[in-house]
Amino acid sequence: VSRAKIGTQEVNALAAADALMALAGHRRQQVWEASAIKPAPALLKSVPTRERPLFLPDTPEGENILFDYKATGLTLRRHPLALLRERLATRGLLSSEQLNALPDGQDVSGCGIVTLRQQPQTAKGTIFVTIEDETGPVNVIVWKSLRETQRAEVLHARLLAVHGTWQRSEENGTAKGYGAVRNLVARRLEDLTPLLGRLGTSSRDFH
């Protein structure tokens, strides 16, 4: 790091993003050692330090995922909903994988992090929302009437539970599961964002 002449601010940002693992180990250790870096006067740069190193315990997985999103907006670790799956299952909320195995017309409930909101000009007030969990995305259709009664959930929820009807149609001439159109048509929405704790996520919104 010193050879590359990287500034203190950049070193701290790299440590927060868990990018210095090869130099300092796990993230908590990286952040600790990065915070200890202070510019030294030219005369003292060659003077060795005699401080005994302090070794910190590793960060729990959930906290690491939280810091990943805070530092970079994404994570290469497990999806946040993998950590919440048991709690979501007790609420009767199915995963994307489970939904995709269901037949057309079934009443279902699913949940995911909102990654996209679209409101095309030709949709007459309908909003298309994409939610995502650890097994994949789910396309959600929110009709204008529901949007008007649950506007806060539609526009502001980061973790959204959707209760509605599973819509699935197979294209002619395609193998089952291929070329299928799958949507969850919302009947009721539930904002479960508090379950994410301090996790910062954002969606791409298009109008």
Which residue ranges define each predicted feature?
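Sliding clamp-binding short linear motifs
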Residues: 1-101, 120, 165-167, 172-207
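Hydrophobic, well-ordered secondary-structure elements that form the walls
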Residues: 72, 112, 131, 157, ...
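Short, surface-exposed secondary-structure edge patches
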Residues: 99, 105-106, 149-154
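Short glycine/proline-enriched turns and hinge-like loops at secondary-structure junctions
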Residues: 106, 121-126, 153, 177-178
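Structural detector for short beta-strands of small beta-barrel domains
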Residues: 107-121
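Hydrophobic core residues within well-ordered beta-strands of beta-rich domains
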Residues: 108-110, 127, 160
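OB-fold (S1/OB) nucleic-acid-binding surfaces
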Residues: 120-145
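Short nucleic-acid-contacting surface segments enriched for D/E, G, S/T with interspersed K/R
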Residues: 146-163
